[in-house]
From Swiss-Prot:
Protein name from the UniProt record: ATP-dependent Clp protease ATP-binding subunit ClpX
Taxonomy, superkingdom: Bacteria
Record key words, sorted: ATP-binding, Chaperone, Metal-binding, Nucleotide-binding, Zinc
Family membership: Belongs to the ClpX chaperone family.
Molecular-function GO term, any one: zinc ion binding
Subunit structure, as described in the record: Component of the ClpX-ClpP complex. Forms a hexameric ring that, in the presence of ATP, binds to fourteen ClpP subunits assembled into a disk-like structure with a central cavity, resembling the structure of eukaryotic proteasomes.
Amino acid sequence: MDRKNDGSAQEPRCSFCQKGPDSVKRLISGPDVYICDACVELCNEIIAQEHVQESVDAGKLLSPAEIKARLDEYVIGQHTAKKILSVAVHNHYKRVFFAETLSDEVELEKSNILLVGSSGSGKTLLAKTLARVLNVPFAIADATTLTEAGYVGEDVENILVQLLQNADYDIEAASKGIVYIDEIDKISRKGDGPSITRDVSGEGVQQALLKIIEGTEANIPPKGGRKHPQQEFIRLDTSNILFIMGGAFIGLDKIIEQRMHGGAMGFGVKVASKKETPLSDLLGNVHPNDLVKFGLIPEFIGRIPVITHVNELAEDDLVRILQEPKNALVRQYQKLFELDHVKLRFTSNALRAVARQAIERKTGARGLRNVLESVMLEIMFNLPSMTGVKECVINTAVVEEGKEPIFLYQTEAKTGT
């Protein structure tokens, strides 16, 4: 540093903001330079912000509109659910990426999500697609297999084992992953009041799940399996893991309807019937108290701030699902046939017949593959042995009556017959 002419040293000042020792808490000295505590904090914020910007540039932090647009590529319908999910997921990962820049004055809570809707309506697909869009590790668990620690069944922490395995044991990646717990309605407690007897697969599991969905340091066996005292554990912080839970919640609509319309009696009172209030409208009005009445404990519901529903899929929805998504079943079969140099075509009535069969089986979208597999089995068995086939047409008779499809051979295809 420069010296004064009288030989006395200049008062040390921060080389960045020029503040003296009386204006700052601390000055850190280096070779001919000083930096104050305020500038150190500012530098840390700049570095953290650059880290966040790198994450954004890498596509990890998408806007809600971008997330929904990506979901639209794979999931048909469910626009309200997709909007709610997109906002919740965006806020969750914004909280994760900006954690280093957030002040201690404001604590952002996790945006865990509950999806209510019938089987085959797309709950699992939504969660799985979110993980694909965000490029984070993903794990699916079945709530019906979970029990309290010490009982026959899977410990709740085994959910995290699968997530860690899917992340190739990258703890940092796993700590920002997504876990989908299906059939969450099946662990509702028995009865309205607190359980007096041990309920190892109901209220007990809800109690066991509380900590990991809220955020805790979980001890995980290195290669899965049961814990034992001599074993070394992997510690996984679940504070930034997004938990999405789904269930059919059969009977929840009656609880909602009773709250909305029940209790009023007498002349002049309009009684709402089920026909007047569609199931989707009822589920769209679900409140946390309805879920408590169903059997989820208040503490559990309190850790799931985002609750939405998915609609039952109609015939038109299923027909679109067969054709429109990037991984649509019809597209997949057409690609398989294309590898054998055969064009595959479904008539519109044939696709509707497939959709109707899935509805009759009450399996929703997941039943479409089973129906198509049955329809296509004999065709795909025989086709590789056939010669000269250029086009295969699946009509209603093939789907409903098991008849042979229309095969167009090379000469016929050329003449257009």
